[in-house]
Amino acid sequence: MVVGPLIAQEEAPTFREDQIYLSIAYPYFSDAPNTLIQNKLSYAFSFGFVRDMPINKQRSLAVGIGLGYDQATIYNNNLFTYAGNNISATVIEGGYQQNYLRMQSLAVPLELRWRNATETKHAFWRIHTGVSVHFPMQFKSYNQTPTGQINTAKLPSKGTILRLNVHFGFNTWNISIAHDLQPWAV
């Protein structure tokens, strides 16, 4: 029998906060002309995945990068058309059944992430901030008149859209605020 001190390496924590996200939001035009009025319940939803890459020993700071899908549907009172490289918006005077703008994009979020989590503490506070790069897939206008006539228009987008994001939350719930740095339309 041998008696002596045992020496072992302390195991480093290995947890990370990889995230599968699903969000529902209310989109709002912050700089729309006075003639554009949002109506009904406009909505946006997104889903995706963010890979967490801790950058300190405590694993309380991390960088996140992900991939997702984003769609916003904004009900409003304007008929949007595209002709001759020009988008025009006209207030609909005679009524309509349904009228909206729909924007769909592929999103790549880049985040700086803070949390007060440990390897065994699963209910914790978090703040994530960063940008998401959006690659527009579709930008269109849809209008249905009271007689049932349907008008659609594919609208050109400016290309890549940058969006500032701030997410804060506790445990499984987050509140998010986002702002596009440039308009979608050309």
Regions found by a protein language model. Give the residues of each.
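Short glycine/proline- and aromatic-enriched beta-strand/turn motifs that initiate or cap beta-hairpins
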Residues: A8-D52
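Short loop/turn motifs that connect adjacent beta-strands in outer-membrane beta-barrel proteins
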Residues: Q9-E17, P54-L61, A117-W125
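Predominantly the C-terminal beta-signal and adjacent terminal strand-loop region
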Residues: E11, A153-V186
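Residues that define the transmembrane beta-barrel architecture of outer-membrane proteins
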Residues: R16-D18, N39-F45, R102-V108, A123, ...
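Transmembrane beta-strands of outer-membrane beta-barrel pores
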Residues: I24-S30, L67-Y75, W114-N116, V131-F139, ...
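Extracellular/periplasm-exposed beta-strand and loop segments of Gram-negative cell-envelope proteins
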Residues: P33-K40, I74-G84, A89-M103, P136-P146, ...
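Residues on the lipid-exposed face of transmembrane beta-strands in outer-membrane beta-barrel proteins
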Residues: F47-M53, L67-Y69, V108-N116, T129-V133, ...
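Outer-membrane beta-barrel transmembrane strands
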Residues: Q98-E119, W125
